[in-house]
């Protein structure tokens, strides 16, 4: 209800209250010698407080009754989302499993650091934006023309932000890794660059997913997820023998393929062809790539890692 009503202030207050209390208890338990159980208690307490505070503020409580009609309606919608979510979870963990089995501890560490850095702009910012945009899309599900306008507008804004951040991070990967993690982790820079190119497409994929959910076409969500994972697993199997860099490059290829799949199914629910969607994205992509080329060229003239970051970030901001 709070998300649909766009009451993010109350959600923030509830989340912050739960975090403060649970972290306080966690710190106390850590100092009194509870060890790893501290993390267990802190996580459980945080979730319990969130539930209790939401119940108290929203005044909604579950009833001890079962509605077959509601179950059928929700199952038809939610079961496909559940299956697509399971496919995504299995695939994500498959990469970690393969890397852990096939490569050395050093390479696993380099990949892990590169992966974490690449997620900060793409996944986290997109997740925050989605919480605001999804209710807007749902509110216009009966008005396809307005839904189409919202989709184009917010897609371009989000992609301008994420594309610029990811391409900027790609160009500054080496100095950032050396500054934050020291030069011992410098091999992670190449992996970070490849993953930045891969995950810059995440907001496009996610926006297609949001539109399909907003109009209730979770069958398209599941079909698209099956196609994506078949392609991604095939790419994974082909790149395993070629090394960890090839695997990261394979992720980029897979996610670009996912963009085309998502756009194809989105074009079926709103009057916006794949060509028109790319036409909307092209100016944003051109600006971001031009910025990347420019700051990369500037970086070639600077040797010091700190100076590169200090000079190139303001230039990138002014460029965009």
Predicted feature descriptions by range:
Residues 1-3, 14-26, 39-55, 84, ...:
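Short runs within selected transmembrane alpha-helices of multi-pass transporters and secretion channels
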Residues 3-4, 62, 114, 118-162, ...:
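Helix-loop junctions and terminal segments of transmembrane helices
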Residues 9, 13, 52-97, 107, ...:
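Interhelical loop/hinge segments that connect adjacent transmembrane helices in multipass membrane
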Residues 24, 28, 32, 126, ...:
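Alpha-helical transmembrane segments of multi-pass membrane transport and lipid-handling proteins
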Residues 28-30, 89-120, 135-139, 174-184:
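Helix-terminus/linker motif at the lipid-water interface of multi-pass membrane proteins
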Residues 36, 73-77, 81, 97-119, ...:
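Interfacial/gating helices of multi-pass transporter permease domains
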Residues 48, 80, 95-97, 109-126, ...:
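Alpha-helical transmembrane segments of polytopic membrane transporters and translocases
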Residues 279-320:
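Transmembrane alpha-helical segments of multi-pass transport proteins
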């Amino acid at each position: 209800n709070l998300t649909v009503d766009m009451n993010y202030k109350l959600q923030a207050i509830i989340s912050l209250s739960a975090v403060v209390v649970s972290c306080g208890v966690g710190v106390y338990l850590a100092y009194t010698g509870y060890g790893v159980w501290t993390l267990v208690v802190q996580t459980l307490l945080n979730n319990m407080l969130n539930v209790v505070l939401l119940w108290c503020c929203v005044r909604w409580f579950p009833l001890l009754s079962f509605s077959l009609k509601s179950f059928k309606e929700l199952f038809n919608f939610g079961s496909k989302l559940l299956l697509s979510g399971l496919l995504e979870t299995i695939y994500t963990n498959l990469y970690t499993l393969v890397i852990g089995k096939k490569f050395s501890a050093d390479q696993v560490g380099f990949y892990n650091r590169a992966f974490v850095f690449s997620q900060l702009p793409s996944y986290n910012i997109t997740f925050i934006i989605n919480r605001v945009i999804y209710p807007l899309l749902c509110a216009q599900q009966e008005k396809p023309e307005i839904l189409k306008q919202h989709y184009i507008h917010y897609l371009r804004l989000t992609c301008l932000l994420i594309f610029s951040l990811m391409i900027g991070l790609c160009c500054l990967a080496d100095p950032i890794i050396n500054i934050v993690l020291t030069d011992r982790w410098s091999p992670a820079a190449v992996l970070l660059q490849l993953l930045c190119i891969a995950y810059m497409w995440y907001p496009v994929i996610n926006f297609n997913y949001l539109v399909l959910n907003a109009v209730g076409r979770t069958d398209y969500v599941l079909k698209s997820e099956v196609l994506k994972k078949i392609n991604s697993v095939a790419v994974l199997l082909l790149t395993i023998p070629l090394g960890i860099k090839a695997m990261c490059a394979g992720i980029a290829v897979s996610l670009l393929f996912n963009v085309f799949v998502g756009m194809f199914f989105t074009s079926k629910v709103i009057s916006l062809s794949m060509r028109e969607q790319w036409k909307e994205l092209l100016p944003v992509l051109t600006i971001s790539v031009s910025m990347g080329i420019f700051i990369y060229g500037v970086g070639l003239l600077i040797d010091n890692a700190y100076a590169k970051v200090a000079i190139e970030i303001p230039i990138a901001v002014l460029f965009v």
